[in-house]
From Swiss-Prot:
GO cellular component entries: ribonucleoprotein complex; ribosome
Molecular function GO labels: rRNA binding; structural constituent of ribosome
UniProt GO BP: translation
This protein's name: Large ribosomal subunit protein uL23
Family: Belongs to the universal ribosomal protein uL23 family.
Record's keyword terms, sorted: Ribonucleoprotein, Ribosomal protein, RNA-binding, rRNA-binding
Ribonucleoprotein listed as a keyword: yes
Subunit structure: Contacts protein L29, and trigger factor when it is bound to the ribosome. Part of the 50S ribosomal subunit.
Domain of life, source organism: Bacteria
Function: One of the early assembly proteins it binds 23S rRNA. One of the proteins that surrounds the polypeptide exit tunnel on the outside of the ribosome. Forms the main docking site for trigger factor binding to the ribosome.
Amino acid sequence: MKDPRDIIKRPIITENTMNLIGQKKYTFEVDVKANKTEVKDAVEKIFGVKVEKVNIMNYKGKFKRVGRYSGYTNRRKKAIVTLTPDSKEIELFEV
């Protein structure tokens, strides 16, 4: 099994994801090859919380051109992790 820190790349902080935190839903950018079970285990191990469910979205790379060179940006995978009602919250901004 991979190291949990290799699976969870970073939290995604936007206005929409900050509104979801009130519902105990946290959004992370994860490794492209990770599946729902690996994401669940990684979040539980890193943050010490209980995960109820995981929703995953795949994003393909966008086509970009710079002068005569063209190519695609990197693929991404985003995971929305829902915690159980009795689980503690994840501290994204430590004081």
